[in-house]
C-alpha cells in the first residue's frame, strides 16, 4: 500500500551571528584556548533563517561583565557601558547555552569577518568549559572574504589586489546606501543577513 505521506523537503537553517567585545586581540592568529589573547564578549546577537531568508528567530543579549569593566573606547563605540551591561546583561553562560542550542539545529553559520567572531565566542565557550569544537566544526561562510572581488576596493598594500570590504562598504555596494546602528551586534547581523541573500541571488555565495 502506498504511503499517503509525501516526502517533505526539510528546509536548511542558517544562523547569522555577530559579537561586540571589550577591545581587540593582540594576535589574530592565536588559538581560541589562548584566553589572555581574546577580548571578552559584551554582546552576542544572532538571527536564524530558513534557506530563503525567512526569519525564524532574532536574539540579542548584552553580557553581564564578570571580572572586567568595559573600556571607554568600546563603551563610546557600542553604547554599552559597564553600568548598562550590569543592569541589562545576562550571564555569559546563559547567552552561550541559548546560542549553542540554536546553532545545533543550523546547517550553516554566516558572519562578516566570521573568523574573528568564531574566535571570540570559541574562547568564551572554552573559558566556560563548554564544547567550543562544535562551533568551530560547523560549516561557515564569511561575507567579507566571499565579496572581496565583487566589491573590488583597491588595497593599500604594495602587492596590490583588493582589500577586505567592511560590512558598511559591502552594504553600500549592494544597496547604494549604508545602514543605521553599525557597532550594535544586532544591527550588524541584520545587515549581514541582507547582504548574504543579495550575494546568494548573484551567485557569489
Give residue spans per PLM region.
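Catalytic-core regions of hydrolytic enzymes
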Residues: 86-105
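Short acidic, Gly/Ser-rich segments with clustered Asp/Glu that frequently serve as metal-coordination loops
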Residues: 19-27, 32
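Metal-dependent phosphoesterase core characteristic of DEDDh/y 3'-5' exonuclease domains
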Residues: 2-7, 12-14, 27, 38-82, ...
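Adenylate-forming
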Residues: 32-33, 75
